[in-house]
Every structure is written in C-alpha cells, then in structure tokens.
Amino acid sequence: GALGVTTSSGPGIALKGEAMGLAVMLEIPLLIINIQRGGPSTGLPTKTEQSDLMQAYYGRNGECPMPVISASTPADCFDAVYEAVRIAVQHMTPVMFLSDGYIANGAEPWRFPKSEDLPAITVNFKKGLDEGEEKLQPYKRDEKLVRPWAIPGTPGLEHRIGGLEKQDVTGNISYDADNHQHMVKTRQAKVDKIADYIPLQKLDSGAATGKVLVVGWGSTY
C-alpha cells in the first residue's frame, strides 16, 4: 500500500534490472532514481555523463516498458520527482527518474513549496468487491488500462501476483501465446496512454513549425 523508492547509479542500476522487470509484470508503483555518471562499468564514478537513457528505456529483458522522466536543474528535481510519483501511483507502474552528477553537485536558490500549493496526487485504493464480483480480479482494468490497487491484507481482497505471465483479468498463471501477446500489448498501451494526461510541451524558441526540431533533456537542456 505504499510507494517503493530506490536510488543508485552506474552498475547499480543494471543490478536492479531484474526487480524493475518484476515491477512491470506486477504493475505496481515504484520509483527508480538513477544519478548518471561516466561508464561503462565503474567508469568515472565522480564525473557526470548522460549515457543511461537507452538503459532506462530498454535495459530489461523482454517487452518491459516504463515511463522515464529527467530533471533539468537541482530545483527541477523536486517537480520532476513529484510528477514521477504521481504517474507511478495513478498509473500503477514503475517510473525511472534520471538525474546526473552535474545536477547532483549543483546548487541554486529555491523556495520550498507549501503542501497546499502542490497539485493533488489522488490514490484510489480498492476497498471492496464490485457488484457481481465474487473475488478480486487483479488485472481487471479501468479506462486508463490501470489495474486495481488493493492494500495487502484487506479482508475479501486476497489475491496472488508474481513474475510469471498472468491471464488477463483473473491474474492466473498463463502460458497461452495469444494471452501473452495480449498482455505485452496491454502493458505497452498503458504506458503509452500516460501521455494523454500530460500537457503538451512548449517550444522555448523558434517557429512553431519547421524541418528541424532540437530537443534537449536533463542537465544539457
């Protein structure tokens, strides 16, 4: 019933890959924070680098999608992490947050916001069975393709999830090829739909249309 958070950099993120894949399969909220440094291997552990973007997207086995968010400045880390938490708990997904050594060692004046000024993060825990539901269907989805979140130990909502592929809706273990293909596409579609709830980005400068678009991210934005 709570959000998991883990932080590392370099090879430490590689070691967490198996658990990240499990979180994708379980469809549970998890925040993975990667403070990027020079690599590969031990590499340049005290120097900054933005070299883990492809790892954040694809560094897990199988079809294993998750949202990736990056901060641009030390102050932006607060807003970016806050947004990552919102996405994780409202869309039942692990989220990768990318910072780097330059940001981590940076400093700037920043006013800590009042809690009442922050956008609300609403979490809808499942409290009981729906009408006509005999037992919890752990992979029954809403319009956002998000499965229900029942706090472990809630009477009447006992269920089982794990790393083996699950049958759609019921959550029973399934080796059926058609079901696996359906679940792979559904997990990807759920992550893709998150974009429907994020405002369109604005151009910093230049014309609204053109042949070339320059996109910056992270500390080199």
Regions found by a protein language model. Name each.
Residues 1-58, 67-88:
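Thiamine diphosphate
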Residues 80, 85-221:
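Flexible, low-complexity linker and terminal segments
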Residues 2-5, 64-65, 207-212:
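Short, surface-exposed connector motifs at secondary-structure boundaries
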Residues 17-19, 40-45, 64-72, 103-108, ...:
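Low-complexity, flexible helical/coil segments
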